[in-house]
Amino acid sequence: MTYIAKPKFHHPALPTNALGFTHRDYEGAISTLCAGCGHDSISAAIIQACFELDLPPHRVAKLSGIGCSSKTPTYFLGSSHGFNTVHGRMPSVLTGANLANRDLIYLGVSGDGDSASIGFGQFAHAIRRGVNMVYIVENNGVYGLTKGQFSATSDPGSKSKRGVVNHDQSCLLYTSPSPRDCS
């Protein structure tokens, strides 16, 4: 992936927060994600929240797993600390970083495949431990980087871009009294 920096021009009339930062100071690189996937909207909300909460970008550590969500930390808080972990292990790495340096604000970004499949145990234990962090799961229902296979959070009966229907029988665990009801 090519790193494309945004221009650093700051108009003198741009509003600033209590720290003197503009909204642009909380942005990162230009996004290369697919248009309309929703991850850019989440990044925009993170930028807005950090601006409004007057968080110094250098005090934020952002961690991610693997998948489309792993790319999103590049697009916000360009002056913060960042680390991409191996698939499903972001909560454990974030826990270790938090134990090593409690002065930072920890933000974990993970996808539905990363959190609800291979990393579900890591996710559950981070919740159980009560780690001081913000954990954002970007749920788009597919493994987007590998071309759209259904993830663990895909709705039963949903269709892929190629028209394949999700017949995942795991929906029996939480929605249907009999196998015939699960489409």
Question: Where are the predicted features?
Answer:
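Short, charged low-complexity linear segments at domain edges
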Residues: T2-F21
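Thiamine diphosphate
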Residues: I66-G144
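Single conserved hydrophobic/aromatic residue that forms the stacking wall/gate
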Residues: Y174-S183
